[in-house]
């Protein structure tokens, strides 16, 4: 049977694309190979968001060519085929992000499909995450025009899925053991705008392609629902009642990017120091236990020490639960590249280190507030007898902290258990099964 090697790079949205490609390949009768040597062809799903990601993608393509020789490239970097051909002219085919059919066509040119999918039962969806959690993509593309970002050029304008289609996928996942649904998009709050928030039928029930209505129906499935990448203004307030009612996890991933109003204007992003703090205060009044994650860019062109200090002051006062930080990296094709006053690399790195040092203090302070409390933990791993590693509502897989739990030895992966917190580190918690 024909074997395909597969490498998936980039964000959770790219991971969903990889799962779709692998599921379709499985339906056509292909097997996946864990090694380059055993595979008859390798697919590389690339990332092209920042220069470091581009370089990593090009290096992986080169490695696959060296070890295997037959490579099909897809994903965000595939939207810039000249970049790939310049370094690796021998790749078999290049497709852009989300172009599943073109990937399948490219594979079948080299390796004809082992079977006719119309004559066989379609196998279950291939998942690249553990069985108990899954990413569900609500939309593709983005209509925002942030000056530092080229996602609209790579992935196109906003294209939302019908609500019934999303709910059907979520229901299938929950029926097969998924305990946590992580909803992803470039901007979840824009979901359905391109569809005019039209209705579709889920069973015999009409559901609007609008985030609040979708979530209200999805909550009936009983899984944890976690939201990633929600534009900060103005839609967050509409989602808070669902969190207060326990229908959606009280967790928000809101990329604020900066706190200096001047820098945010250059980024073409909304808000600033005062408006950010006002919004956070209003959200926490509705959902006091709300966990907030955000990402920030330091060293953006024109960022002065004063601008950076505004960001530090904001983080001290905002007390965000989780923070990611990037030193600004010029992305080929981004409008921000034309801005004057670039920040020297050593200054970018120094500011990044200062921000992380401050946030580490904030994170420890926040974590220590949970000592003595009992939290619900979703078990991810059982590394040894009597020990479990899991996550609370505050922790998204792979990017946030974890909870190390002393257990009675009977818990299973995917189970939700009460845990009494005994100790807190900067990013992680330690406790005992209650």
UniProtKB/Swiss-Prot annotation:
Residue span, Radical SAM core domain: 128-365
Classification via NCBIfam families: 30S ribosomal protein S12 methylthiotransferase RimO, MiaB/RimO family radical SAM methylthiotransferase
Keywords per UniProt: 4Fe-4S, Cytoplasm, Iron, Iron-sulfur, Metal-binding, S-adenosyl-L-methionine, Transferase
GO-annotated biological processes: tRNA modification
Function: Catalyzes the methylthiolation of an aspartic acid residue of ribosomal protein uS12.
Domain of life: Bacteria
Gene Ontology CC terms: cytosol
Species in which this protein is naturally found: Thermus thermophilus (strain ATCC 27634 / DSM 579 / HB8)
Name of the gene: rimO
Annotated positions binding [4Fe-4S] cluster 1: 11, 47, 76
PANTHER family in the cross-refs: RIBOSOMAL PROTEIN S12 METHYLTHIOTRANSFERASE RIMO (PTHR43837), RIBOSOMAL PROTEIN US12 METHYLTHIOTRANSFERASE RIMO (PTHR43837:SF1)
Name by which UniProt lists this protein: Ribosomal protein uS12 methylthiotransferase RimO
């Amino acid at each position: 049977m024909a074997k395909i090697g597969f490498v998936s790079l980039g964000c959770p949205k790219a991971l969903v694309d990889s799962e779709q490609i692998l599921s379709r390949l499985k339906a056509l009768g292909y097997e996946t190979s864990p090694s380059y040597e055993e595979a008859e062809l390798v697919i590389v799903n690339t990332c092209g968001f920042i220069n470091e990601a581009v370089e990593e993608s090009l290096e992986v393509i080169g490695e696959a060519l060296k070890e295997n020789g037959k490579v099909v490239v897809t994903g965000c970097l595939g939207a810039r085929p000249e970049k790939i051909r310049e370094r690796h002219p021998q790749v078999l085919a290049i497709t852009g992000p989300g172009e599943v059919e073109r990937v399948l066509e490219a594979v079948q040119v080299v390796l004809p499909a082992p079977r006719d999918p119309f004559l066989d039962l379609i196998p279950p969806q291939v998942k690249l995450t553990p069985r108990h959690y899954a990413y569900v993509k609500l939309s593709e593309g983005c209509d925002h025009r942030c000056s530092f970002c080229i996602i609209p050029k790579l992935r196109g304008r906003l294209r939302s899925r019908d609500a019934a289609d999303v709910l059907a996928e979520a229901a299938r996942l929950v029926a097969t053991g998924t305990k946590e649904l992580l909803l992803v998009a470039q901007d979840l709050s824009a979901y359905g705008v391109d569809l005019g928030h039209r209705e579709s039928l889920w069973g015999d029930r009409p559901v609007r392609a609008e985030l609040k209505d979708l979530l209200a129906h999805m909550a009936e499935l009983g899984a944890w629902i976690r939201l990633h990448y929600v534009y900060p203004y103005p839609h967050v307030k509409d989602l808070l009642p669902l969190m207060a009612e326990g229908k959606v996890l009280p967790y928000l991933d809101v990329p604020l990017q900066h706190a200096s109003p001047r820098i945010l204007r250059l980024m073409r992003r909304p808000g600033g120091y005062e408006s950010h703090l006002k919004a956070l205060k209003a959200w926490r009044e509705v959902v006091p236990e709300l966990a907030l994650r955000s990402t920030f860019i330091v060293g953006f062109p024109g960022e002065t020490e004063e601008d950076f200090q505004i960001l530090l002051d904001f983080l001290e006062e905002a007390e965000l639960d989780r923070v990611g930080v990037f030193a600004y990296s010029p992305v080929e094709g981004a409008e921000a590249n034309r801005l004057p006053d670039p920040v020297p690399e050593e200054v970018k790195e120094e500011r990044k280190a200062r921000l992380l040092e401050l946030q580490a203090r904030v994170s420890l302070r926040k974590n220590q507030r949970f000592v003595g409390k009992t939290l619900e933990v979703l078990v991810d791993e059982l590394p040894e007898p009597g020990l479990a590693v899991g996550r609370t509502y505050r922790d998204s897989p792979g990017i946030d902290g974890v909870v190390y739990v002393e257990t009675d030895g009977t818990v299973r992966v995917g189970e939700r258990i009460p845990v009494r917190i005994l100790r807190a580190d900067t990013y992680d918690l330690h406790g005992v099964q209650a």
